[in-house]
A protein has these predicted regions:
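Short glycine-aspartate micro-motif
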Residues: 1-3
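Short beta-strand scaffold segments in enzyme catalytic cores
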Residues: 9-13
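A contiguous, well-structured pocket-lining segment that forms one wall/lid of small-molecule binding clefts
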Residues: 54-136, 145-147
Length: 155
């Protein structure tokens, strides 16, 4: 189970009612909080997720190279405080709508990269914990389109 909200971001192995194990969690700020803070810095009203999606469609996702804290560390833990700080610094330099669109697109791309990698690690851990012989992670299906769909539906 991947839980993402304004207050929590966690990977859980749910074995049954009341039986779960946390595989990873945010060590600082939740992803939903990062979305809301980014939206506020871009002048978007709450809730920010759907509006960031709209702005991101008009932007260049490669314009800003945003940090991915603990991205290359093993495990399923997440960190978004450094990303929020980078957005704060860049937002102070924005002068045009296009720069705003580009920052929204870069922010969304960075989040997708983080969640894709950490979700893949979580699936691997799930396979180990449940002694699965077959691969559960659907390599080709669980791609960018699915993550984009998750963002649209649940943020």
């Amino acid at each position: 189970l991947l839980l993402i909200s304004g207050g929590h971001s966690q990977y859980l192995n749910v074995r049954g009612l009341g039986k779960y194990q946390r595989l990873g969690t945010t060590i600082d700020d939740a992803l939903g909080e990062a979305f809301d803070k980014t939206a506020k810095l871009l002048g978007i009203e709450f809730p920010g997720g759907p509006q960031i999606e709209i702005l991101a469609k008009k932007g260049d996702p490669n314009k800003y190279d945003l940090p991915k804290p603990i991205f290359n560390k093993g495990g399923c833990n997440l960190s978004f405080a450094g990303l929020k700080t980078a957005i704060l610094k860049i937002s102070k330099t924005i002068k045009t709508d296009q720069e705003k669109f580009d920052l929204a697109a870069s922010f969304q791309k960075t989040d997708e990269q983080i969640l894709y990698k950490k979700t893949k690690i979580a699936f691997s851990e799930f396979e180990k914990q449940n002694n699965l012989k077959e691969k559960v992670f659907p390599q080709q299906f669980f791609g960018k389109k699915l993550l984009n769909h998750i963002f649209l539906v649940y943020f």
